[in-house]
């Protein structure tokens, strides 16, 4: 289900405040956040945001193609190691 247009996208207030401060100062720092549910907005373009994946903060450089997506989409939480190989020789 999509969000109402009159409400606008969800962006954590503390994250939006930090980005606006950096835009005013014209600085590029890594912003650490746990807010995976925040939507990427155009003011974030060009910044590096470290998103928590459950173990560590993964730095993600925001580009224009990411606008409209959630931060959590780019910080994977699970690692797929692959299925076990079937070893026919050891079964004999």
Swiss-Prot record:
Entry keyword annotation includes Chloroplast: yes
Main location: plastid
Location in or out of the cell: Plastid, Chloroplast
GO process annotations (BP): ribosomal small subunit assembly; translation
GO cellular component assignments: chloroplast; mitochondrial small ribosomal subunit
Keywords: Chloroplast, Plastid, Ribonucleoprotein, Ribosomal protein, RNA-binding, rRNA-binding
InterPro entries recorded: Ribosomal_uS19, Ribosomal_uS19_bac-type, Ribosomal_uS19_CS, Ribosomal_uS19_SF
Single GO molecular function: structural constituent of ribosome
The keyword Ligase is assigned to this record: no
SUPFAM superfamilies documented for this protein: Ribosomal protein S19
Entry's family note: Belongs to the universal ribosomal protein uS19 family.
Annotated HAMAP family: Ribosomal_uS19 (MF_00531)
Function summary: Protein S19 forms a complex with S13 that binds strongly to the 16S ribosomal RNA.
Protein name per its UniProtKB record: Small ribosomal subunit protein uS19c
Organism field: Anthoceros angustus (Hornwort)
Lineage of the organism: Eukaryota, Viridiplantae, Streptophyta, Embryophyta, Anthocerotophyta
């Amino acid at each position: 289900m999509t969000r109402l247009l009159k409400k606008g996208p969800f962006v954590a207030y503390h994250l939006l405040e930090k980005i606006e401060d950096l835009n005013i100062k014209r600085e590029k720092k890594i912003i650490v956040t746990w807010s995976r549910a925040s939507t990427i907005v155009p003011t974030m373009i060009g910044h590096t945001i470290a998103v928590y994946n459950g173990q560590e903060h993964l730095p993600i450089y925001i580009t224009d193609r990411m606008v409209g997506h959630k931060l959590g989409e780019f910080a994977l939480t699970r690692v797929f190691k692959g299925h076990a190989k079937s070893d026919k020789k050891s079964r004999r």
